[in-house]
Amino acid sequence: MKMSKMFMPTLKEIPADAEITSHQLMVRSGMIKKMTSGVYNQLPMGLRVFKKIEQIIREELNKKDCQEILCAALLPSELWKESGRWTAMGEEMFRLKDRTEREYCLGPTHEEAFTDIIRQEITSYKQLPLNLYQIQVKYRDERRPRFGVMRTKTFTMKDAYSFDVDDKGLDKSYQDMFDAYVSIFDRCGLENSPVQADSGAIGGSTSAEFMVKSEVGEDEVVFCSGCDYAANVERAESCNLASQKEEMKELEEVHTPGAATIKELEEFLKTSPDKFAKTLVYEADGKTVVVVVRGDREVNEIKVSNAIGSVIEFALATDDVVRKVTNAEVGFAGPIGINADYVFIDKEIVEQRNIVVGANKTEYHIKNANYGRDFEGIVGDFRNVQEGDKCIVCGKPLEIARGVEVGHIFKLGTKYSESMNANFIDKDGKSKPIVMGCYGIGVERTAAAIIEQHNDEKGIIWPLSVAPYHVVIVPANMKNEEQISIAENIYNDLQAMGVEVLLDDRDERIGVKFNDSELIGIPMRITVGKNINEGKVEFKLRHKEDKEIIDIEEINEKVKAEFIRNNVRLG
């Protein structure tokens, strides 16, 4: 491609609304153009990158015998009502009606659509296993679009769905997709970590996220310093404290005027917060929920809502509800005698002795409370992991980092097949629900994550596998016919080899050309300048500072060597 004919609106200045590096560089390099909040047009340079990521995805999934289809983006509400997600998806779903008042949505995801296809066609175990995928635009009415293509209202996703006869088959499908994802992200040049994750509104028993460590990541990820344990903070667990052996003391009610928070109580009683139990009151679809954690801990609301199951609305209770549940003002709730639909007790509380709890009485607390003797509830892990907690696998300290999710895989089980009657006849002639998995990758988000990992002060440093073009040829002087002629010969030779080449034939200063090539991140640059008098050109790799002067005859082999080094096919 000759740059004089290319639509590539680059910018020198950083856009005012671009908060993170990938957003800034995507806009500045002419990859994307904002249409409105959360909606971006993809320009030629960006589209080439996105299509290359899609092609890598296709190649790796096809190796696993997955088959590509394309579902409609406009989906009838009936399918979502069957699965129970028409309401559960909440305000993120774009809903609309046609002229006959029939309800539809713009697909935010496609579990229902794929299940509908399969239930109409699959009747026997002989037709399974099966794995279908698509690369399709999704629509989600994000409350706060941000970070460029990281969080938008429309985005491209590869979503795949596996269909098996039993859990053993699902385990194999899940592992195949896990392995495919590792290969996909490796080929994209992404350093990533698979981590245990919460399944969220999609549902299912097991899921893993593929996370890219990044300071601008919206997710917190827990990593062990001593083993391979890694989990999203929503799912992460840590070891409990060792059981305390001291004898249980008698309950003692204490007047604590003005001490309605842990900090105030800590100062009033001169006791550390790990000696307190913090009792929080929530509402879940009209039910009252009480959660008790140690005073220096935070409640993990995802774990609590998962313990309840199928929760649509989950939030801290209003002051009026707290007063009704505790018969006291806010700040004095405790687990002893509390009146709630659910009472959840974090496992750490069970191991503690003689803790301080709210008395459910305004301006009073109770000392020496003990689980089992004084209060009970549903015991489980309902707290957030903190930096330095001990790993549940090896006992070493845990670390917390921010990350960007680029892929997510789920074991759905029979969640959708049961609700939508997607059944098959097994070897014994019995009807059984198909066992499913689903697997997603965000295409534009993957590109943004690559930029977050591969950039410098000059611009993007694309890995060769996903670069919009492999080589840029820069004639130093557009008034020098010999330079132009040699540049065009190199351009034609490399194209004939299957190399994707940019020829910067613009009538611009060489500094402008260099700046643009570095901004857009082309992996290799060949400069045709004064050295042609000696039959030589300048060769430079984007990720290195040094330059080489090489013979023109060496160019083809030099470029080939980079493809081999990066394990990228030519042509």
UniProtKB/Swiss-Prot annotation:
One of its GO terms (molecular function) is ATP binding. InterPro entries: aa-tRNA-synt_IIb, aa-tRNA-synth_II, aa-tRNA-synth_II/BPL/LPL, Anticodon-bd, Anticodon-bd_dom_sf, Pro-tRNA-ligase_IIa, Pro-tRNA-synth_IIa_bac-type, Pro-tRNA-Synthase_IIa_type1. Its main location: cytoplasm. It is found in: Cytoplasm. Keywords: Aminoacyl-tRNA synthetase, ATP-binding, Cytoplasm, Ligase, Nucleotide-binding, Protein biosynthesis. One of its GO terms (cellular component) is cytosol. It comes from the Bacteria. One of its GO terms (biological process) is prolyl-tRNA aminoacylation. It is an enzyme of class 6 (ligase). It catalyses: tRNA(Pro) + L-proline + ATP = L-prolyl-tRNA(Pro) + AMP + diphosphate. It holds the Pfam family HGTP_anticodon. Belongs to the class-II aminoacyl-tRNA synthetase family. ProS type 1 subfamily. Homodimer. Consists of three domains: the N-terminal catalytic domain, the editing domain and the C-terminal anticodon-binding domain. Catalyzes the attachment of proline to tRNA(Pro) in a two-step reaction: proline is first activated by ATP to form Pro-AMP and then transferred to the acceptor end of tRNA(Pro). As ProRS can inadvertently accommodate and process non-cognate amino acids such as alanine and cysteine, to avoid such errors it has two additional distinct editing activities against alanine. One activity is designated as 'pretransfer' editing and involves the tRNA(Pro)-independent hydrolysis of activated Ala-AMP. This is Proline--tRNA ligase 1. It comes from Clostridioides difficile (strain 630) (Peptoclostridium difficile). The lineage of its organism: Bacteria, Bacillati, Bacillota, Clostridia, Peptostreptococcales.
